[in-house]
């Protein structure tokens, strides 16, 4: 009985220790949070991203970019969706932190409608996050 419990635990442990899919990057700058938010809003279209939500009071912005050129050997696969989630906040000493999370989703067309499955962040979304931070670092 004990060996079955131990074997079950050993088999489930790797499933619980998965790596996070999102790629997080951050930077600190001397500009005010409002100015950093304006910079992010200005730079996102230059990177090909479309703003999908904005919380001006909390200095958060989300943007999406669709990759319709990606192909998979699955008839239900539709496209890849790259998302940038940016959160800006004041830090001690008058600095402002800019935190960017890049995420990639595979969008499938199923019987219940469009379904997104999160994948490891693509190189494209990681590159866009780095370029965004470099442009808005000040």
Residue ranges of each PLM-predicted region?
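C-terminal motif of bacterial Sec signal peptides marking the signal peptidase cleavage site
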Residues: 13-15
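Sec-dependent signal peptide recognition
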Residues: 2-9
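Ser/Thr-rich, low-complexity intrinsically disordered terminal regions
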Residues: 17-138
